[in-house]
C-alpha cells in the first residue's frame, strides 16, 4: 500500500495559503480521480478490494492533511 500523505501534503503546501478550502477540495478530487484511473489501468487488473484499500489509504492521507490545516488555523 502506498503512502499518499507526503504527496498530498506537498501538493497542499504548493497552494496559496490564503486560498479557500475549495482549492484544497479540488486538489483532493483530482488526486482521487487520478488514483482510480491509474489503479484501473494496471495490468494484470487489481481486484476491487485492492482498489478500495488504496482509495482508503488516500482518504486517510487527506484526513491527516486536513486535521493539520485545522490545527494551524486554530493556532493562528
Where are these regions (language model features)?
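A membrane-associated low-complexity tether/scaffold signal
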Residues: 2-17, 21, 28-37, 41-76
Amino acid at each position: 500500500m502506498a503512502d499518499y500523505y507526503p504527496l498530498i501534503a506537498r501538493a497542499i503546501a504548493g497552494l496559496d495559503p490564503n486560498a479557500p478550502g475549495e482549492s484544497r477540495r479540488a486538489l483532493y478530487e483530482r488526486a482521487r480521480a487520478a488514483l482510480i484511473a491509474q489503479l484501473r489501468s494496471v495490468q494484470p487488473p487489481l481486484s476491487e478490494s485492492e482498489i478500495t484499500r488504496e482509495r482508503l489509504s488516500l482518504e486517510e492521507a487527506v484526513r491527516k492533511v486536513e486535521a493539520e490545516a485545522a490545527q494551524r488555523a486554530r493556532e493562528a
